[in-house]
């Protein structure tokens, strides 16, 4: 693995350990060069309660690797989480900087009704 990826995963591990200690439901984000994925994971980490990505049929047609797509994913994951009965989550940015697509997804999820 590259040094950049190793340091990102180390940051993610530290944050996830803290969330596991607090036993909170988390909104986990993964970003690749072409797509962005979001999952709402149960407090014990065993179940995915809601998920959305730019690979979903609703979002696949437009551009998938930009801020607009991340905003749509954020709104969709918030809608699905509310349907699953989740309103409070901890934001797991997976070691990515809170900037650009990750920030856009978080802001859209907040607007959709999720509380961080």
Curated annotation (Swiss-Prot):
This is Large ribosomal subunit protein uL18. GO terms for biological process: translation. The lineage of its organism: Bacteria, Pseudomonadati, Pseudomonadota, Gammaproteobacteria, Pseudomonadales. GO terms for cellular component: cytosolic large ribosomal subunit. Keywords: Ribonucleoprotein, Ribosomal protein, RNA-binding, rRNA-binding. Belongs to the universal ribosomal protein uL18 family. InterPro entries: Ribosomal_uL18_bac-type, Ribosomal_uL18_bac/euk. It holds the Pfam family Ribosomal_L18p.
């Amino acid at each position: 693995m590259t040094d950049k990826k190793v340091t990102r995963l180390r940051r993610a591990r530290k944050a996830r350990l803290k969330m596991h200690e607090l036993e909170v439901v988390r909104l986990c984000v993964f970003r690749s060069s072409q797509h962005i994925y979001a999952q709402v994971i149960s407090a014990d980490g065993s179940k995915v309660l809601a998920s959305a990505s730019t690979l979903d049929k609703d979002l696949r047609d437009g551009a998938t690797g930009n801020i607009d797509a991340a905003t749509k994913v954020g709104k969709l994951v918030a809608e699905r989480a509310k349907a699953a009965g989740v309103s409070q989550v901890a934001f797991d940015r997976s070691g990515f900087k809170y900037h650009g697509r990750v920030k856009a997804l978080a802001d859209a999820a907040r607007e959709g009704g999720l509380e961080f």
